[in-house]
């Protein structure tokens, strides 16, 4: 049960890890993104690859897909039970679920990115204002309730992406897909 087509934690990270470690063989041309779908379907038989709005879409959907017996494994968060089972009668008892090893790595959060054209004083002021949210009572509320994060920290692209880049480079056609998508 995947979270959705080309979703980071529910598809790209685990499939990139498994392909890169020789656990799954790529089916189809290595430079076409649809080879990923073919690879998943060949390896997992009845894989659930939902689209936005489908019953099993997202983290809750992947966990529900597993719970309903649609799939044998869900690529979701380790906190899925806590995140999705309170008040949901579709969940099984906690001891009916088992987290499998290895953890595939950590998918980076959604970053706040500063426009490089705003270099210098303007960029520094913007970064300082965003980081000030960490220490301001109203700022903490904004971080938690609007941005859904406990805080902001400055990072480089390399440190932010970490092992994620290594894993997704194994996805067939991913480079061509993103080049075509963002080459405007």
Go through the PLM ranges and name each one.
Residues 1-63, 68, 141, 149-150, ...:
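Bilobed "Venus flytrap"/periplasmic-binding protein-like clamshell domains
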Residues 23, 71, 117, 131:
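Residue-level marker of positions within ordered structural domains that often coincide
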